[in-house]
Amino acid sequence: MTLQIIAGRSGTGKTTYLMDEVSVKIKQNSKTYIFIVPDQMTFQMETSFLNKENLEGMLGTQIFSFSRLAWKILQETGGLSKTFLSQTGIEMVIRKAALDQRDKLKIFSRATSRKGFYAELANLFKEMKQEEVSIEDMVKSATNLSTSVNNKIHDISIIYQKYEELLADKFLENEDYLRLLAEKITESDYLNQTEIVIDGFTSFSQQELTVIGALMRKCDKVTVSLALNVPEIKHGLDEYSMFKASTEAYYALLELAKLNSINVEEDKFFLENKRAKTESLAFLANAWGHNKFMAFKEEPHNLSVHQANNRRAEIEGVAREIRQLTLNGYRYQDMAILTRNLGDYDVLCETVMESYNIPIFIDKKRAMSKHPFIEFIRSSLDAILFNWKYEPIFQAVKTEFFFGVAEKSSVLRRKADILENYVLENGIQNKWKWEKEGDWIYRKIRGLSTNVLPQTDGEIQTQSIINEMRSLIVNPLSTLELNLKKAKTGMEFALALYHFLEQVNAVERLESWRQRAEEQGYLELAREHEQAWSAISALLDEFVEVLGKETLDLNSFVEIIATGLDALEFSLLPPSLDQVVLSDMENAKLLDMKVIFAIGMNDGVMPLRQKDNGILSDQDRDALRAEVSNLKPSAKNNIGEEDLLAYKIISLPSDKLFLSYPAADEEGKVLSESNYLRKIKGQFKKLSESVYLTDPGLLSDAEQSSYIRSKQATLGLLTSQLQMYKRGYPLSSVWWDAYNSYFENGKESRMAKQVLSSLYYENKTKPLQEKTAKNLFGETIHASVSRMEKFFSCEFQHFAQYGLKLEERGHFQLQAVDMGEIFHGAMEWISAELKRNNLDWGSLTDQECRQMAKLAMTFLAPKIQHEILLSSKRMEYIQYKLLQIITRATTVLNEQAKSSAFRPVGLEVDFGLKGDIPPLKISLQANSELLLQGRIDRIDMAEQEDRTFLRIIDYKSSSHDLALTEVYYGLALQMLTYLDIVVTNAQKMIGKTAEPAGVLYFHMHNQYVQAEKELSDEAIVKELQKNSKMKGLILSDPVAVSLMDTTLEKGKSSNIVPAEIKQNGELSARSKTATREEFDKMRHFVRHKYQEAGNKILDGAVSINPYKLKERTPCQFCGFRSFCGFDPSLASNQYRHLTNEKTETILAKMNIEGGEQ
């Protein structure tokens, strides 16, 4: 029974010596030789043995980690009768323990719902077992500490005790195996006549030391290899040394040997670096960690430092280096990429390496949480927990597990989209609405549904799809909820979930995905689908095993299962024989590597800027370690560990070391280089730093040629270089050679043409062919005024909405257009009610105005947007505010009518083929025509002797005025069109001809009067009248004006219309008026604009040409922005800049362009 320690820095040949020693001994005796290495190194050590010359296979030699050795010995001695708990199971049990003790927690009661909390607790409990720290010691130590620490340890204690109670000596964790191993080693026959070699560790936990002590007592010899600085053993421990942990391990092993009366052979020290093949790498490895500054005066061959623009440029630079190294004879398996922050690089590396045709193995387990099956389970449980809210329901729906396997996915997705649109538009946000008896009724309703028409065939077909999909969701989800709410124990809850997964045929869905992935060659994806079901089965089995008899409620079950789902990970396949390995620095499973790329060497990353991420802060640990010395030290006392990690990286390669860092992150934030890089550059005075650029155009031709390493990656660079060339920048001949090379091969030529076509890309549309235009819009264009205004706003917007019939997804929310519908509907209803009762505007009292408004709102509220105004308390309040506006508008209109001779003769008057008035017909080219149809809010009439006047009033929920500039550009055609139609059809409407009296906007809003002193009721009414003055354009005729405001006096302004009378009885310049001749010119011009638009539509005009008038553009509220891709930064995408001009100028232009129609 002997202990021997082999010591020396990394790369000095310790592992090679041990393997050689064993190879000699195997031939000399029949002993068993066991190598114990860290978990992540077992595969690499086995591979090294197999590749070892003169070693006759593995006979007589076994490679174990501590945990694998525990399995082996416990299988032999009978210590495996208890059930093993995975990390997932541990976190679920901890969550159950925390939930049970939640009311007793002093600090962690809120943290129990925080994601990651249970993983942190699991890590702390793991540490306690590894370091043989009892909870009693923790509690005792915390007694004399601050209240904060004491409360924290109190919470940890009661959760830990409940956790141990739930395990109840029936279950084992990884750490329990080492405890049992230490107990069972003496009973093992397998360890008789055995020598143990322990290699690859820098430190040992207390549990591992206990196991090593038992092995010392049992086995013939225990040899331990430690990477440490030999002088520190001889001259004393340096508190901040990177070898502090291994030096402490050295002394702990000697103390163990002494306690167990074990013979200690003389230490064997290795001093010379044998791994590094160049002086520079050997110097760097030997000098690292020395307090004394050491400088390398020669040119440092095979050591390089690179700055990159960003992480992508960095990885592309690494990829180019790898490609060059393979041309020089290296294999991919000779190289590894190491980083401290793997999460910043894994996806990027996978993408870039694929474009360079470099096989890569990413040594990182991926969380299962994003797999559709896991998301389906989580979302289904959340749907039940949150009363069938939209978000979790459709997160589950989109995984496709509710639907049959037989039907095509594309068909199912289309149907699911139809269902989702219906649910969103109808505000279906709870279980009651989902389970409500009877079919859901589908009608394509826009605005007020006062006149319900029979369903169309299309609506009936859509309704059928909606109810089909609804039943596929409701049936299994209702069953799941029923079973979960009946469940009392963990077993019953788990069975409810399992039966739900059976009901939706989850296994068949996963199997179909697996088969399809295999057929398409996506083997890794196929394995993930296979693992997903296995993982859930194991999770439920483990849940039942541990918590099956525990009493639970629904919330607790969902929280515990969610914790388990968060902990699930996909297992990794070992790397193939020839792949580049990407790994994080701390867990790299590497032994002998020729080339290392250490990436992401930034300040704060290497060395790591320490943060308190665990349950116990650094301050907590420092305070507790005064009495619980086995507890791991705080981060600030582990400074040497960062130096050691860097040392492992720089001492790993035998041939080449590439060190790199990005100068900026993805958002352009500046990143500094690591202090370690500054230190290395200080030691190597002749070490020059090169740059990995995104754009190599500034480099020399020779340097640019190094960027050409693969056809796919080079094509992207070539495109960007040619783009710069188009802008006038010089282009190296290197890129012309690359360009020509793509057209020497047919397949590559096709790919190049497709990619390089982007050089000539312009975001422009081509006019539709005549036939296509007529198919989309018809030879006779049936259009509304707003449609034509949209065409003049942007031709492509018109094409998207009226040609392609694209629609924005409807949502169950009250929008401005809905409020406009309510206001129009209310005014129509009140006017109709007055007519039914033989009453006129102006004859109502204030009380009657309020009553009318209330009755109108009562009638309209259930008829807008699927009863949205009745759907919630918030909507009830909005309804109240809308009622205030309608009441105010009714009162104002009533007061205006008292002072006006104009009376309504038409409300919500339809014009069109089926309207009260015929459509406005506009002749177009090629014998086509445009039929204009729509609805006029209100038509007023007044008579004076032999003259009859007609005017248009439009109700608006926001302030509007008639701007002739907007009329001229076709953006505001509505009011003058309506005026033209009623004047043209006056004989049909009122039985006589009429003159145009004007167009006015009535702003419906809840106005307030501001005053410095208290006002009488009469004064308040006058102020409200003044604030409610209608805007627009009226006839420049004193007679017409006097009919609009019968109270208007000389020298006064009207409170009703935009008019002011001078003392001489004429209209002032401040009045917004136009002559009869000007109105006629405007009417003719408007018809001309419709003709212009109609002809352009038939010509296939679909240009992306939004206007810009001051700061206003149609893009601001356009639902098709992502579709058209309009980008003002492109030369091909520019606004049509419109300018405001004087009224006289605009009228002159209208006269010239409009002419007589």
Swiss-Prot record:
Its cofactor is Mg(2+); [4Fe-4S] cluster. GO terms for biological process: double-strand break repair via homologous recombination. ATP binds at G8, R9, S10, G11, T12, G13, K14, T15. SUPFAM superfamilies: P-loop containing nucleoside triphosphate hydrolases (SSF52540). Keywords: 4Fe-4S, ATP-binding, DNA damage, DNA repair, DNA-binding, Exonuclease, Helicase, Hydrolase, Iron, Iron-sulfur, Metal-binding, Nuclease, Nucleotide-binding. GO terms for molecular function: 4 iron, 4 sulfur cluster binding; 5'-3' exonuclease activity; ATP binding; double-stranded DNA binding; helicase activity; metal ion binding. Binds 1 [4Fe-4S] cluster. It holds the Pfam family PDDEXK_1. PROSITE patterns: UVRD_HELICASE_ATP_BIND, UVRD_HELICASE_CTER. It is an enzyme of class 3 (hydrolase). [4Fe-4S] cluster binds at C794, C1115, C1118, C1124. The keyword Lipid metabolism does not apply. The keyword GTP-binding does not apply. Gene3D superfamilies: 3.90.320.10, 6.10.140.1030, P-loop containing nucleotide triphosphate hydrolases. Residues 272-590 form the UvrD-like helicase C-terminal domain. Belongs to the helicase family. AddB/RexB type 1 subfamily. Despite having conserved helicase domains, this subunit does not have helicase activity. Heterodimer of AddA and AddB. The heterodimer acts as both an ATP-dependent DNA helicase and an ATP-dependent, dual-direction single-stranded exonuclease. Recognizes the chi site generating a DNA molecule suitable for the initiation of homologous recombination. The AddB subunit has 5' -> 3' nuclease activity but not helicase activity. This is ATP-dependent helicase/deoxyribonuclease subunit B. It comes from Listeria monocytogenes serotype 4b (strain F2365).
